[in-house]
């Protein structure tokens, strides 16, 4: 009877160890996934900060002014020629 008890006891310890080993494995896996997600969030925040720098409204004002100037530029010589005509 005694060897059976020892074998059952060792089997119980082995099952307990196996369960905790799986739990530890799962915990390590979750920690690694969490760290990866945190790193991705930080990189995403950095990219968002860069987007704010690119979307500077002052730069857009200059671009808009150049676009308007390109549309009006061909008409400037006509305005210059017609300006003295109206002063007579």
UniProtKB/Swiss-Prot annotation:
Superkingdom to which the source organism belongs: Eukaryota
Tissues expressing this chain: Expressed in entodermal epithelium along the body column.
Residues in the signal sequence: 1-18
Intracellular or extracellular location(s): Secreted; Target cell membrane
Pro-sequence residue ranges: 19-59
Main location: secreted
List of residues that carry Valine amide: 85
Cellular component, GO, one term: extracellular region
Alphabetical UniProt keywords: Amidation, Antibiotic, Antimicrobial, Immunity, Innate immunity, Membrane, Secreted, Signal, Target cell membrane, Target membrane
Family: Belongs to the arminin family.
Function: Antimicrobial peptide with a broad-spectrum antimicrobial activity. Keeps its antibacterial activity under a wide range of salt concentrations that mimic physiological conditions of human blood, which is surprising, since Hydra is an obligate freshwater animal with nearly no salt tolerance. Does not affect red blood cells.
Full protein name: Arminin 17593
């Amino acid at each position: 009877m005694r060897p059976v008890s020892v074998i059952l006891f060792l089997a119980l310890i082995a099952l307990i160890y196996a369960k905790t080993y799986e739990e530890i494995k799962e915990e390590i896996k979750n920690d690694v996934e969490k760290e990866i997600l945190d790193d991705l969030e930080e990189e995403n925040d950095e990219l968002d900060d860069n987007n704010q720098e690119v979307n500077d409204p002052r730069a857009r004002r200059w671009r808009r002014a150049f676009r308007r100037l390109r549309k009006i530029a061909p008409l400037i010589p006509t305005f210059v020629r017609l300006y003295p005509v109206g002063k007579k």
